Amino acid sequence: MRTEIATLGEFGLIDRLTEGIKLENQSSKYGVGDDAAVLSYPSEKQVLVTTDLLMEGVHFDMTYVPLKHLGYKSAVVNFSDIYAMNGTPRQITVSLGLSKRFSVEDMDELYSGIRLACQQYNVDIVGGDTTSSLTGLAISITCIGDADKDKVVYRNGAKDTDLICVSGDLGAAYMGLQLLEREKVVLQGDKDVPVSYTHLRAHETCADL
């Protein structure tokens, strides 16, 4: 069964996608449901903010990307930026540009991936927006996090002889992208095809280090 987004309207869709969301972080004072989220961070913390915009046809291809995987990946790429600066992600806002090609059920699937990522990394969804799009799907996520003021890691802080550490399999996600673009099929993130799974559902392993 397909439900057109127009049958719910913008606010009805937002209510459906965010139903049952609970705030887990102490810095999240008020989330979805008002004109703005309310956040409160301790004075000894530095607040970190990052935004990523993903555009259909540029950053992902709906031919082979399941919506749940896309939602998950859209969230964790933002978490990654916060972790990279030695911070902890706390909240996100999610904004979507949707063409008429997408149904309410499609957005349920996309949001299930976003919510799964937030549950795994203890991040609160505190707001967002939806609008119509003439060119497909656009996903913009802003992530807010915190770090101890004297422990923020900047790119320009790298020095000669510093040890560079990486996690995961370098190049695996790119190899997965090449395979998916060649085959042009949805592999459903099959773990029997490791590189395609790595590309479809990126994991932010820094949180586990």
Give the residues covered by each predicted segment.
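Residues at secondary-structure transition points
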Residues: G33, V65-H69, K73, E105, ...
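Glycine-rich anion-binding loops of enzyme active sites
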Residues: L54, P89-V185
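Small-aliphatic-rich amphipathic alpha-helix that forms the alpha element of a beta-alpha
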Residues: L67-Q91, S112-Q120
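Extreme N-terminal cap/leader segments of soluble proteins
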Residues: M1-P66, V94
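Residue-level signal for inorganic ion chemistry
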Residues: V38, N78, N86, I125, ...
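Polyanion-binding loop/helix "lid" in catalytic or ligand-binding cores
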Residues: K191-R201
